[in-house]
Protein backbone atom coordinates (compact mmCIF):
# COMPACT_ATOMS: atom_id res chain seq x y z
CA UNK A 1 0.00 0.00 0.00
CA UNK A 2 1.94 3.00 -1.24
CA UNK A 3 -0.51 5.84 -0.64
CA UNK A 4 -1.98 6.51 2.76
CA UNK A 5 -5.73 7.03 2.89
CA UNK A 6 -7.19 8.27 6.13
CA UNK A 7 -10.24 6.61 7.60
CA UNK A 8 -13.36 8.78 7.68
CA UNK A 9 -14.80 9.61 11.12
CA UNK A 10 -17.64 7.17 10.36
CA UNK A 11 -15.18 4.40 9.48
CA UNK A 12 -13.23 5.04 12.68
CA UNK A 13 -16.40 4.85 14.76
CA UNK A 14 -17.48 1.61 13.05
CA UNK A 15 -14.03 0.05 13.38
CA UNK A 16 -13.75 1.00 17.05
CA UNK A 17 -17.13 -0.63 17.68
CA UNK A 18 -16.50 -3.74 15.58
CA UNK A 19 -12.96 -4.38 16.80
CA UNK A 20 -14.19 -4.52 20.42
CA UNK A 21 -16.65 -7.30 19.62
CA UNK A 22 -15.77 -10.89 20.42
CA UNK A 23 -15.60 -13.69 17.89
CA UNK A 24 -18.64 -15.87 17.41
CA UNK A 25 -18.25 -19.61 17.87
CA UNK A 26 -18.33 -20.16 14.09
CA UNK A 27 -14.84 -18.62 13.87
CA UNK A 28 -13.28 -20.75 16.60
CA UNK A 29 -11.50 -24.07 16.25
CA UNK A 30 -9.98 -26.31 18.91
CA UNK A 31 -7.17 -28.80 19.01
CA UNK A 32 -5.37 -30.70 21.71
CA UNK A 33 -2.13 -29.13 22.85
CA UNK A 34 0.08 -28.94 25.90
CA UNK A 35 -2.18 -28.62 28.92
CA UNK A 36 -5.42 -29.66 27.22
CA UNK A 37 -7.60 -28.08 24.55
CA UNK A 38 -6.35 -25.06 22.68
CA UNK A 39 -8.74 -22.55 21.05
CA UNK A 40 -7.60 -20.76 17.89
CA UNK A 41 -8.81 -18.99 14.77
CA UNK A 42 -7.87 -20.50 11.41
CA UNK A 43 -5.82 -18.41 8.99
CA UNK A 44 -8.53 -18.15 6.35
CA UNK A 45 -11.03 -16.95 8.98
CA UNK A 46 -8.65 -14.23 10.18
CA UNK A 47 -8.13 -13.05 6.59
CA UNK A 48 -11.88 -13.15 5.91
CA UNK A 49 -12.56 -11.03 9.01
CA UNK A 50 -9.82 -8.53 8.10
CA UNK A 51 -11.32 -8.18 4.61
CA UNK A 52 -14.79 -7.67 6.11
CA UNK A 53 -13.55 -5.04 8.59
CA UNK A 54 -11.01 -3.11 6.55
CA UNK A 55 -12.05 -3.95 2.98
CA UNK A 56 -10.11 -6.12 0.57
CA UNK A 57 -7.90 -3.15 -0.31
CA UNK A 58 -7.84 -1.52 3.13
CA UNK A 59 -4.98 -3.55 4.58
CA UNK A 60 -1.82 -5.37 3.55
CA UNK A 61 0.40 -8.00 5.06
CA UNK A 62 4.16 -8.08 4.66
CA UNK A 63 6.46 -10.95 5.55
CA UNK A 64 9.28 -8.99 7.21
CA UNK A 65 11.50 -11.96 8.03
CA UNK A 66 11.58 -15.73 7.81
CA UNK A 67 14.29 -17.55 9.77
CA UNK A 68 15.11 -21.23 9.95
CA UNK A 69 15.75 -21.67 13.66
CA UNK A 70 16.91 -25.26 13.39
CA UNK A 71 17.05 -28.20 11.02
CA UNK A 72 18.05 -31.60 12.33
CA UNK A 73 18.43 -34.72 10.23
CA UNK A 74 18.42 -38.16 11.85
CA UNK A 75 17.80 -41.65 10.48
CA UNK A 76 16.55 -40.27 7.17
CA UNK A 77 14.05 -37.97 8.93
CA UNK A 78 14.00 -34.19 9.24
CA UNK A 79 12.93 -31.87 12.07
CA UNK A 80 12.71 -28.15 11.27
CA UNK A 81 11.61 -25.01 13.12
CA UNK A 82 10.98 -21.66 11.46
CA UNK A 83 10.08 -18.23 12.84
CA UNK A 84 8.48 -15.39 10.89
CA UNK A 85 7.66 -11.74 11.46
CA UNK A 86 4.62 -10.33 9.66
CA UNK A 87 3.49 -6.70 9.55
CA UNK A 88 -0.14 -5.76 8.97
CA UNK A 89 -0.60 -2.20 7.67
CA UNK A 90 -3.95 -0.47 7.35
CA UNK A 91 -4.76 2.05 4.63
CA UNK A 92 -4.02 4.96 6.99
CA UNK A 93 -0.53 3.66 7.82
CA UNK A 94 -1.41 2.16 11.21
CA UNK A 95 0.45 -1.12 11.62
CA UNK A 96 1.13 -3.98 13.99
CA UNK A 97 3.64 -6.78 13.63
CA UNK A 98 4.29 -9.97 15.53
CA UNK A 99 6.28 -13.17 15.40
CA UNK A 100 4.95 -16.60 14.51
CA UNK A 101 6.42 -20.07 14.67
CA UNK A 102 6.09 -23.23 12.59
CA UNK A 103 7.63 -26.66 12.83
CA UNK A 104 7.63 -30.08 11.28
CA UNK A 105 9.00 -33.12 13.01
CA UNK A 106 9.93 -36.55 11.71
CA UNK A 107 9.41 -35.65 8.04
CA UNK A 108 10.66 -37.95 5.29
CA UNK A 109 11.36 -34.95 3.06
CA UNK A 110 13.42 -31.84 3.77
CA UNK A 111 11.38 -29.89 1.21
CA UNK A 112 8.03 -30.89 2.71
CA UNK A 113 9.28 -30.07 6.21
CA UNK A 114 10.49 -26.62 5.14
CA UNK A 115 7.29 -25.88 3.22
CA UNK A 116 5.02 -26.78 6.13
CA UNK A 117 7.11 -24.97 8.75
CA UNK A 118 7.43 -21.80 6.66
CA UNK A 119 3.70 -21.63 5.87
CA UNK A 120 2.80 -22.35 9.48
CA UNK A 121 5.17 -19.64 10.76
CA UNK A 122 3.88 -17.04 8.29
CA UNK A 123 0.22 -17.83 9.06
CA UNK A 124 0.85 -17.80 12.81
CA UNK A 125 2.60 -14.41 12.56
CA UNK A 126 -0.23 -13.02 10.41
CA UNK A 127 -2.87 -14.10 12.93
CA UNK A 128 -0.85 -12.78 15.87
CA UNK A 129 -0.35 -9.39 14.16
CA UNK A 130 -4.05 -9.12 13.24
CA UNK A 131 -5.15 -9.88 16.81
CA UNK A 132 -3.40 -6.73 18.01
CA UNK A 133 -6.08 -4.66 16.27
CA UNK A 134 -8.82 -6.00 18.53
CA UNK A 135 -10.97 -8.76 19.96
CA UNK A 136 -12.85 -9.58 16.77
CA UNK A 137 -9.57 -10.38 14.99
CA UNK A 138 -8.60 -12.97 17.57
CA UNK A 139 -7.44 -11.10 20.66
CA UNK A 140 -10.47 -12.37 22.62
CA UNK A 141 -9.02 -15.89 22.36
CA UNK A 142 -6.42 -14.88 24.94
CA UNK A 143 -9.22 -14.26 27.49
CA UNK A 144 -9.60 -17.55 29.39
CA UNK A 145 -13.11 -16.63 30.63
CA UNK A 146 -14.23 -16.06 27.03
CA UNK A 147 -12.76 -19.32 25.72
CA UNK A 148 -14.23 -21.36 28.57
CA UNK A 149 -17.71 -19.87 27.87
CA UNK A 150 -17.37 -20.56 24.14
CA UNK A 151 -16.89 -24.29 24.77
CA UNK A 152 -20.60 -24.50 25.59
CA UNK A 153 -21.93 -22.37 22.71
CA UNK A 154 -23.05 -24.28 19.64
CA UNK A 155 -21.83 -23.16 16.25
CA UNK A 156 -24.65 -21.95 14.02
CA UNK A 157 -25.49 -24.06 10.99
CA UNK A 158 -24.26 -22.82 7.64
CA UNK A 159 -26.85 -22.03 4.99
CA UNK A 160 -25.60 -21.85 1.43
CA UNK A 161 -27.75 -20.03 -1.11
CA UNK A 162 -26.95 -20.52 -4.77
CA UNK A 163 -28.50 -18.09 -7.22
What are these regions (language model features)?
Residues 3-13, 46, 53-161:
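Positively charged, aromatic-enriched nucleic acid-contacting surfaces
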Residues 1-47:
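N-terminal, Lys/Arg- and Ser/Thr-rich interaction peptides
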